[in-house]
Amino acid sequence: MQMQTYKLVVVGGGGVGKSAITIQFIQSYFVTDYDPTIEDSYTKQCNIDDVPAKLDILDTAGQEEFSAMREQYMRSGEGFLLVFALNDHSSFDEIPKFQRQILRVKDRDEFPMLMVGNKCDLKHQQQVSLEEAQNTSRNLMIPYIECSAKLRVNVDQAFHELVRIVRKFQIAERPFIEQDYKKKGKRKCCLM
């Protein structure tokens, strides 16, 4: 069986833990130092629902000064983790902006995304309630999961769930792609 590659992109504001989640998933290691990312890529092979998969993961810059680079990596992504920090409400407020930008770049009404509330281990500092996150998730029509990169809670589940979302999307898209291909095949050429 051919191993399918999935191009996943991790987006979100600065300091929300995008790199911590990604490195915890790839290397089972929690990064304690904050070193703003410009762009890092990682690869991991795993079995998701007993189907082998190769994940190409792009960890992106959250800082606004790198926002011009966002559209470039959004073009190639097949699935997106939209990460915010549960202890930083302003990072949560940015999630709809990231969703709109992805949909605009992809020229789609929907696309595979998973909203991730990181730092669920910091309950005493939490600024975004589960109810508020779930309401936004419903409004944006994006599934939601809470995780902790520090404690490795739901980290693997977030990436695996995103792959499941991508797979469902690709299966749903297949009839439309085949239909377009058949239409193109019926065109005739006329030489003058």
Swiss-Prot record:
Cellular location(s): Cell membrane
Residue positions bearing lipid (S-farnesyl cysteine): C189
Listed InterPro entries: P-loop_NTPase, Small_GTP-bd, Small_GTPase, Small_GTPase_Ras-type
Effect of C120A: Reduces palmitoylation. Loss of palmitoylation
Top EC class for this record: hydrolase
Gene Ontology MF terms in the entry: G protein activity; GDP binding; GTP binding; GTPase activity
A cellular component term, taken from the record's GO annotations: plasma membrane
Motif Effector region per UniProt: ranges: 34-42
Example GO BP: Ras protein signal transduction
Activity regulation description: Alternates between an inactive form bound to GDP and an active form bound to GTP. Activated by a guanine nucleotide-exchange factor (GEF) and inactivated by a GTPase-activating protein (GAP).
Membrane topology according to the record: Lipid-anchor
Modified-residue entries (Cysteine methyl ester), positions: C189
CDD domains, per the entry: M_R_Ras_like
Enzyme Commission code: 3.6.5.2
PROSITE patterns for this protein: RAS
Keywords (A to Z) from UniProt: Cell membrane, GTP-binding, Hydrolase, Lipoprotein, Membrane, Methylation, Nucleotide-binding, Palmitate, Prenylation
Pfam (any one): Ras
Catalysed reactions, as listed in the record: GTP + H2O = GDP + phosphate + H(+)
Residues cleaved off as propeptide: 190-192
Binding site for GTP: 12-19, 59-63, 118-121
Family, as annotated: Belongs to the small GTPase superfamily. Ras family.
Function: May be involved in endocytic processes and/or other transport pathways mediated by vesicle trafficking. May interact functionally with ROP protein. Ras proteins bind GDP/GTP and possess intrinsic GTPase activity.
PANTHER family: RAS, DI-RAS, AND RHEB FAMILY MEMBERS OF SMALL GTPASE SUPERFAMILY
Protein name: Ras-like protein 2
Lineage summary: Eukaryota, Metazoa, Ecdysozoa, Arthropoda, Hexapoda
